[in-house]
Amino acid sequence: MDEIIKSTDNRYSEYETLLFLRDKLRKEAYAWKNRYLAEFGNLITAVFEQKIACIKKKKTISFCQMAVNRGKPVDQAELQNYLSQEMKEYNRKLSEMIQENEIAHSGEIISEETAAKIKKLYYRLAKQIHPDMNPKTNERPELKELWQRIVVSYRANDLEELEEAEILVNKFLVDHHLDGNEIKIQDIDTKIEKLKEHIQKIKETNPYQYRFLLQDQEAVQNKKRELQKELEEYRVYEQELDQLLEQMMKNGVSFLWRMN
């Protein structure tokens, strides 16, 4: 049977400390990601957009060549359907990148006082309903939804939203007689080790590692030059593909247009 540790145990204090450290690092990683996108997002998006333009033209050339090999005209409707399917995932990813980039560029800087209030309030709420500390949260859909709201607000530095969430959390706990209950954690030693591993992984990977790049202005400028170079290479490549398509047209590739 798994050992059950009550919230008064010293190992619980260690577990709680590690849990808050992991969440703090997650938030910092999220902030570094936004700073990275604020710095490089426009160029990264432009590079990817140019890349998928080249992919689309390569697929167009391939489709046309297959029609030529069969001795048939290129069916324009079939070509558009083919490209629509083939490019769907690329376009979805591009839309996602554009959205993330917009969010990163719209970020507001908060005061140290507000940051301290957010941290204190988050820790207070986490002690009440963090799913890794209070099993009741995953058992109650309302609490689970409130916790997700808290996580989003914490990462977004939204103090007002956190304050509203605290009111709702306290009301729910009182209404359902869940306030003041002693929290019990099963198999806490294993969970402590997993938390330590997770913390180390966050520290050693992106987006947390972006901080080393962003704190080095020379590295930032080098990164921008690399992205600009990549963008220019894709632009040149697109021109080459345009010339290839134009040559195919000159060599007699014909298109079949269907009238509605």
Question: What residue spans do the PLM features occupy?
Answer:
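Short pre-active-site segment immediately N-terminal to the catalytic Zn-binding motif
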Residues: 110-117
